Amino acid sequence: MSRRCAVRLPGVAALVAAGVLALCTAGGAQAQAPTQARAQSEPAEERPLGQRHLQGPGQGEPQRPRIGLVLSGGGARGFAHIGVLRVLQELRVPVDLVVGTSMGAVVGGAYAAGRSAAELERFARDTDWAAVLADRPSRAAGEFRRREVDLEVPSRIEFGIGPGLSLNAPPAVAGSHALEAALEELLPQGQAQRPAGRLSLGFRAVATDLRTGELVEMSDEPLAVALRASLSVPGLFPPFARDGRLLVDGGLVRNVPVDLARAMGAQVLIVVNVGTSVDHVRDLASPLGVAQQMINLLTEQNAQRSLGELTSVDLLIQPDLEGLDATELATGAQRAIAAGERAARALSSRLEALAIAPQAWASFEQARVQQPLAPGTADTGKLLVRPTGRASAELLAAAAGTTLGQTVDAATARAAADRLYASGDFERVEVQSALLPDGRALILVPVEAPWRRNPLRLGLELQTEQGTREDATRLGLTATTTLRPLNAWGGELRALMRLGSQSTLMGEWWQPLGPGSRVFGVTSWRRDAEAQDIYFDGQRVTQLRVSEATWRLGAGVSLGRSGDVQMGLERSRSRVSPLLRADLASGPIALTTTQAYAQLRVDTLDSIAFPTRGTFVGALWESGGLSGADRGSATLARVLSGFTWGRWAGHVYAEASHASKGSAPLALGGFLRLSGTPISSLYGQTSLFGRMVMGVPLAHMPLGLGGAVRAGLSVELGGAFLPGQSRRLDDLQKAGSAFVSVDTLFGPAYLALGATHRGSRATYVFLGPFW
């Protein structure tokens, strides 16, 4: 059991990103009985390494002071601890116990478990911190059904729909799963499940009980759990639920836990403080920036009290980290490590006084590094999945791409957990080892996230065009939700509504023919309506209101997580009405058709906002009418492929569409569809189009508010042709654009200038899907 602070401390602090939190803000924790006092009753091989090296006179080993290492929290600034450890190892300074908070707990816990400073540096440098700080699974790893929603609503504004239609918002900017996977990868094999207090070095991680504000010492929990709980920075990572408590960053009550190290028996302390000063935060315009400043105010107060407890024999190391933000995990590691090393070397004369002889150091390091596997650690076992309240073990195993009962190793189980997490329904998916009556098992334990249950996604669309013959503005609000699973086979019900210049109402039921079945049936109803400008020779001649209601019934086969193939029947009713006063006498036209369809869709793009990897392929064939003059068909094909070239990235896109009667399914005109021409102003029986888009990153939006800011350009080529018209390359229109793009929470936003080779120009403000 974790030991809580037994003394309630006065004061209540409001924590913006985590809700109201009563905090311990003065005083200290009740002292635990020194671990050295109870060491005499424990077998030597079970005692922490520091205690085994302090047997006292007459036991064959020299007496030396017991050294405690105290590592503060500080986010990316905490990587400075690695530089300090590098110097301690170089000077042969033995550390008998480690107490850490937040990133200090991560670095200190991994060191106590056997990692070297060099291995910790590789972790800081090579970890995909963008994935760790992401608010959801990577798009490329997710299921095709989830990626399909992005094409209609590329927004990241989502809420979970709970009982009584309540809305649940995410509790933090980043998710949990990737962080926990990174921590397990950091720890030596077999140490993630070892109790934090049973390492060869004495170790404690510090967390805060979010409900009570009490300090929580993590000692009996598995090491990976202790590190994860201590690193739960409010607003950045979700609180960690454990034994009925919600645990967050220990820095809120003890960012420099000097008193805990004393209570564990330390006689000399090496304290490394990397906390952010209260006047350092540069971004107070974002919710996360405000939350970070609130945390800084709280941690700075308790840190100063803790530093006041140091004595003349203790060493305080405070690296110069001016200008380094706590959230710069992806870019600040090398700078922080170097700063920590410089600060430690500045005190090398005092550190050398604590050094031990080379032979004693070799023995000390061997015992620290070569630790036995934690009890219950298994390299292989039977794979099981713990069912949730909404999904069976069979359905979850299918989503994880595995089979219940098969024998797997730990890496295979972790890969299955990653695939299950990528379904988008869970906060995290743990891999637990258990000894069952019929043998060892590796169990996938999905932890449901209320903010991902029945997700409601909200979107905003804006397209303004200035400079063409007919300026235009289009605005839309969208909402879509998916209810899943509807049954034991994993059925889904999806709904979409769009209000604005274009109105859409859609409902779809998608039903696999068994748990994990690749074969499915689908039925949908959709109604679209919008005002369309009709152009002739580049000039608007009239405006029509076009509405279409379509019902589909089909079946298909999933292509793994990449796409699907469908075929079936659809029945459509279209209505066209004039909107201009001069055309009202012509009256509306209605048409009802029944036709067969077949479609192929493949989507492995890494991003909808600005694709740089992966491919999108879409092909559709429709044929209707009974025979002769009534028969008609339409086809379209689209291909997009992302690429990178040094710092530049972008995509190449091509499309073609044709109708045996009437207009081709796709019209041209507008931003990135022959930029500089009016929106949807070019149509014919056949349309051809291609473009290349490239951009270079300039900056990055504040964490939690979006992604990269880029400058870029496009080169475009295309045309629409009537029957009998020439379709040579010289007949295609040439266009291009220069733009600044921002990956916002609502999707890709562009400010652009477009032009054609014929001299027409337009400026665009664009937000939403550009397909």
Report residues per predicted region.
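Bacterial N-terminal signal peptides
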Residues: A13-T25
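C-terminal outer-membrane beta-barrel translocator/porin domains of Gram-negative envelope proteins
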Residues: L442-I443, R452, L456-G467, A582-I589, ...
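Gram-negative/organellar outer-membrane beta-barrel architecture
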Residues: A411, A416, R428-Q599, L605, ...
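Envelope-exposed proteins and targeting segments
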Residues: P65-I67, L199-F203, G265-V268, V313-L315, ...
